[in-house]
Amino acid sequence: MTGRSTYGMCAVCREPWAEGAVELLPCRHVFCTACVVQRWRCPSCQRRIGGRRKANPHLLREIADVTMELKRYRKGRSGIDVTQMARKLGGGGVTTSSEIFRRLEGSKNGRWKILNLSGCGSELQDLTALRDLEALEDLDLSECANLELRELMVVLTLRNLRKLRMKRTMVNDMWCSSIGLLKFLVHLEVDGSRGVTDITGLFRLKTLEALSLDNCINITKGFDKICALPQLTSLSLCQTNVTDKDLRCIHPDGKLKMLDISSCHEITDLTAIGGVRSLEKLSLSGCWNVTKGLEELCKFSNLRELDISGCLVLGSAVVLKNLINLKVLSVSNCKNFKDLNGLERLVNLEKLNLSGCHGVSSLGFVANLSNLKELDISGCESLVCFDGLQDLNNLEVLYLRDVKSFTNVGAIKNLSKMRELDLSGCERITSLSGLETLKGLEELSLEGCGEIMSFDPIWSLYHLRVLYVSECGNLEDLSGLQCLTGLEEMYLHGCRKCTNFGPIWNLRNVCVLELSCCENLDDLSGLQCLTGLEELYLIGCEEITTIGVVGNLRNLKCLSTCWCANLKELGGLERLVNLEKLDLSGCCGLSSSVFMELMSLPKLQWFYGFGSRVPDIVLKELKRRGVHIF
């Protein structure tokens, strides 16, 4: 190994000098004895070795002290020149406006303890400069898929690292076999790294407490080793080939508190983990092949969160009745789950997901769950009895999507703490009467509620921030909207009977507005009142011919008028100086003069023009400026 030496350490093995270190002559560099066997040149300076002698302990101490002091003198109090570091990492082409520079500035403010370079793969070219960050404890290189292995090996020289995130990078078996050099590592994430097949080398990380290997689908060797790591408290193996035999290597008296084996289709028997009584969070979602050992679940008395979604053999809640400390439970899409006896004992539950459980017919048991804050019963096709809902006084979030038997909104009118309500697909609801009592409601979804005709009952929901309304075919009256002064996001789709959109123009605080497939929408003059608008979507509104006031929306960042085939004018488009994303797909009626105005938009980053007559000169100019064109 050649190149730079490490202060107070052998430049070959990157460890403190071993006992019996040797001093080379004439260069006087010091190395471990084992690191210069049969070498004819100094590994650091490449000078020919004329001789060697045993290094004096006082000399070693002196070298370490002097070099560290010299390092401080040369680099000043801040220690690292951010501009120079950014240029080294980016191969010389990095400017002060680059993402790398901004990330390094943030790390400098934190005294170089934490560095997040995730997603900077397009700029990163050379990681050698990271060796200067000897104090670095937390490094994130996730999503840097273009970095080659030789660059990633540099990470292993950062001996002070405690946390390392390498999601979706090119790490492989060689990298994993060498990671034992990071002797203080406690947290490691290498999710989605397809080049890893053997993780046996991770067993050397005796201090490791948290390990995530999610979606490393090519690993075939070493699961048994990492399951036996003594200090492990969190292990995530989602979508891997881990087997029952591997899981049996988890020490029953260990410290493991979180285990995620979601979508691990090799798992068939839960007795493999039955002895791990320390577990507090367990995810078995998507383990379709589990056929044995469900009774082991009742032994996890410390369990706080359990996700057993998609378990085809779960038919009764009896195996869950002893989990009295459980706060989060998900049994979604357990098609055969019918017997709910036992769930009423889980009095500490705060979040319950029963979505897609077609066998559930009654909610009477929830009356005992006084601490419940979130309930999802979406898609429970057999549900006919909603008794118990009215007793959930602490409920804040309720999902009733596609529960076609739910007709009476008044059944939830007493849930005064409700913040989010989803009634999408409840096609038999004819009126929103009762919702006016939910004064704290912030988000409401009404997609596919075809019988609703008016918003009048909800005019008093002053705290409502987000409203989704889609395919409400009989909705005609929007007058109730004008009082929702706190509304920030409004989505109105496919409401074909609406003719008067005036109430929407009174929503002065709205930031995101979507009016799509509204066949009668033709007058947009009221848009000029929505001066705080940042995103505007007018999709498939074929009656619109002109948007003359768009230039007044100075804060607009995203504008979409796609498939407004009769649109001919966008007045003041050139004044949208903050516009970043523009979609004019299918606007075949726009003249070339409108497209010419695109060249005056300084912040434009994405442009969609499929099906429109965009002049070639405009496309060339946008490409030259680096705009993403679709």
Curated annotation (Swiss-Prot):
Residue ranges annotated as zinc fingers (RING-type) are 10-46
* UniProt GO molecular function: DNA binding; zinc ion binding
GO BP terms in the entry: cAMP biosynthetic process
LRR repeat boundaries on the chain: 115-123, 124-148, 149-170, 171-195, 196-218, 219-242, 243-266, 267-289, 290-313, 314-336, 337-359, 360-382, 383-405, 406-428, 429-451, 452-474, 475-497, 498-520, 521-543, 544-566, 567-589, 590-613, 614-630
* Signal peptide limits: none
Could you list this entry's UniProt keywords, alphabetically sorted. Answer: cAMP biosynthesis, DNA-binding, Leucine-rich repeat, Metal-binding, Repeat, Zinc, Zinc-finger
Please give the PANTHER family that the UniProt record associates with this protein.
PROTEIN ZER-1 HOMOLOG, PTHR12904
State the function annotated in the UniProt record: May interact with adenylate cyclase to regulate its activity.
Record protein name field: Putative adenylate cyclase regulatory protein
Q: Which organism is it from?
A: Trypanosoma brucei brucei
